[in-house]
Amino acid sequence: MQPAVDNQQLGSQLLKLGIHRNKRRIWLDSPAHLRAAGFLPGLRYRAEYLPGIGLIALHIDPVHGTNKVSKKSKGWESLPVIDINNKRIASVFSDDVSQIDVTYYLNSIVIKGV
């Protein structure tokens, strides 16, 4: 099952899959990519964990979203940040996965293990 995303790719990044408090951590803090995809501070989104295909998809969902885009301040500007730190990441990516390929689409972000 492939998550539904708009076909137009807005950008991509190769990032390190981190660890925080003994759990896998995904930290997305590229303002240009997040804003282009529509992920703004305070906006709600839902995460779709797909262990069978090694993929996590994030979808903007103002009504049913269970997660919120965080922010960090730089001067007077609020920059979007997505911080995912939970056990479900380990169910999607095996222990030998140390990097992730993050692809940005309008209203969606797809994260794959590398």
Cite the ranges covered by each PLM segment.
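N-terminal intrinsically disordered, low-complexity, charge/repeat-rich segments that act as generic
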Residues: 1-11, 24
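Short beta-strand-centered segments at strand-helix junctions
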Residues: 22-42, 66-96
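A short beta-strand-loop micro-motif that forms or neighbors metal/cofactor-
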Residues: 39-56, 93-111
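Secondary-structure transition/turn motif
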Residues: 58-65, 112-114
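Beta-strand-rich non-transmembrane domains
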Residues: 18-22, 52
